[in-house]
């Protein structure tokens, strides 16, 4: 079981991801934007973060940079509808551990997230 932070501004996406991960036995907390995510990260130790790119408060890249200042190894997964050619490579170059495109495949989503957890040091 991992403790996972989901930073996603869309309520329905947040609920879906929360339910899918909880059903797999994970402890999941959610935040709706950069400020909420920062507050959660300041008060709880997480094993991974699912981070939407287009969120209030500056965007996912802003929060990623803050996370990487103190934790270079925790999996931070870009969770976004941005699926244009080159997006995955750009996210990896920015410091994300991986990329999951929306809409998600509910059958494989949990396994995909867990793959990033297993691959982390």
Residue ranges and their predicted role:
Residues 8:
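Conserved acidic carboxylate
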Residues 11-29:
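Two-component/phosphorelay signaling modules centered on CheY-like receiver
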Residues 56, 84:
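The feature encodes the CheY-like receiver
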Residues 61-72:
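Short amphipathic alpha-helix used as the core "switch/output" element in two-component signaling
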Residues 104-113:
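C-terminal output helix
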Residues 30-48, 69:
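Acidic, metal-coordinating helix/loop segments flanking the phosphotransfer/catalytic sites
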Residues 33, 59-62:
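Acidic catalytic/metal-coordinating carboxylates
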């Amino acid at each position: 079981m991992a403790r996972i932070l989901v930073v996603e501004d869309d309520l329905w996406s947040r609920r879906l991801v929360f339910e899918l991960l909880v059903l797999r036995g994970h402890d999941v907390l959610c935040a709706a934007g950069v400020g909420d995510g920062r507050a959660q990260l300041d008060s709880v130790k997480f094993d991974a973060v699912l981070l939407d790119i287009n969120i209030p408060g500056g965007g996912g890249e802003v929060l990623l940079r803050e996370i990487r200042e103190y934790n270079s190894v925790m999996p931070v997964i870009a969770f976004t509808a941005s699926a244009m050619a080159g997006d995955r490579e750009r996210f990896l170059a920015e410091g994300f551990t991986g990329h999951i495109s929306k809409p998600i495949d509910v059958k494989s989503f949990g396994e995909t997230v867990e793959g990033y957890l297993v691959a982390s040091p």
